[in-house]
Amino acid sequence: MPESGGSRAQREHIPNPGTGPGAETPPTLPAQVIRAAGADTVSGAAGAVGAAEAAGAAGTTAKATQTARRTGFLVTMVLGGLTALPPLSMDMYLPALPAVTDSLSAPAATIQLTLTACLAGMALGQLVVGPMSDRWGRRKPLLLGMVVYVVATAICALAPTAELLIGFRLLQGLAGAAGIVIARAVVRDLYDGVEMARFFSTLMLISGVAPIIAPLIGGQVMRFTDWRGIFVVLTGVGVLLTLVVWKWLHETLPPGSRHTGGVTDALRTMRGLLADRVFTGYMITGGLAFAVLFAYISASPFVVQEIYGASPQTFSLLFGLNSIGLIAVGQINGKLLVGRFRLDKVLGFGLAVIVLAALALLLMTLGVFGEVGLVPIAAGLFVLMSAMGVAMPNTNAQALMRTKHAAGSASALLGTSSFLIGAIASPLVGIAGEDTAIPMAVVQVVCAVAAVGCFLGLCRPWQRAGREAAGL
């Protein structure tokens, strides 16, 4: 697989000016006239034509570059918004959980199912929407998903019972999954090689801000209205994103590249992807890295506040700093590392840092270094979270580079596996109660070591490095 190559849209989807079906064909001189004119005349004419073509090409290239920059910015903003919508839907709602419990007169455990339902919907929805986008293109399934998201979110704002709220949170997650899976597929349609890895790092910057600001937005909304107002705001965000997608996100999958089969064909495509050892290796590696992240999200409120006695404000500050570290390293990955080093080498380095940070956290929680305070634990979590900015975008890029004609299905498998593996691992951090951080560290070490094992055992990066060095 090539590790460079720029935008696939420039090579495949955008016809060169003057060569498309609507371009005028320049007149061709008869052979008799050319022979009569002599070699010198032909040479002079060729030189003049070449100069004219060069000048025209330069002007066309400049215009194309400006258009590409404007288009690239719009695509970045649209796809960034789509990938940020699911974390907004999850995290804006968190400050309202106690209020929902009181308002609907339901047990806390029942209201917590509204989070589980939304998360499950996001995981399963990707399996449905991904193959749909490979068959009907990216725009139609995305617009349909956005419309359903808006309707489901609006009904959540009006839900009179906990059961109805749970049901439409599930539908909200199913529909919101369209943004996640199709955003990745669009990136695969438009970019290849290191350009794709860079774009994923940019998306991580945008989507990484969402979990930081979402609880703050939810808390501010609660100052002026009740919990239903949060869903009203999310409905407005959904309407705005739907209009933006309809206006500015054009179709990126041409009809000739689409799959024509039904469910059977989609399942066959996914089975073929899973049969690809290297793709499956990157998929599981990314899922296990995501599980390390989920373990942190699930356990850190209790570890930081209950065990080490930090205030909620201190926890929010540390959570924000860790998110900033992830975003910053993601930008370093996209701007500096990708293109200068092989993606597998960068990914391997990131996974190694995650393993070392997780081991350090485990040793500290076991008391190997004596009694440690919050600062060393916070430092270990910061290093671990920052390294995610290298691991996560590069596993996605490497996996999708192997799927030229099934990016939707591949994106669905990547997203679903990450959510499912994370959902399985995250409850394990509370298996020993809220009084110890050891389960969190154990889950992180096991998942991190398993991620390295999958990367080495299934992806086998040294084999591709040897083939690339040999020019194969």
Locate each region found by the language model.
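Helix-loop-helix hairpin linking two adjacent transmembrane segments in secondary transporters
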Residues: 160, 164, 201-249
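Structural signature of the two symmetry-related core transmembrane helices
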Residues: 140-155, 235, 345-361
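Helix-to-loop junctions at the C-terminal end of transmembrane segments
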Residues: 126-137, 329-344
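Paired small-residue
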Residues: 148-155, 163-171, 375-380
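Conserved MFS/SLC helix-loop-helix module at the cytosolic interface between two early adjacent transmembrane helices
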Residues: 124-163
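Juxtamembrane intracellular "pre-TM" segments in multi-pass secondary transporters
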Residues: 61-68, 252-283
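Helix-breaking motifs and short loop linkers at transmembrane-helix boundaries and internal kinks
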Residues: 103-105, 137, 158-164, 175, ...
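Cytoplasmic helix-loop-helix junction between adjacent transmembrane helices
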Residues: 168-207
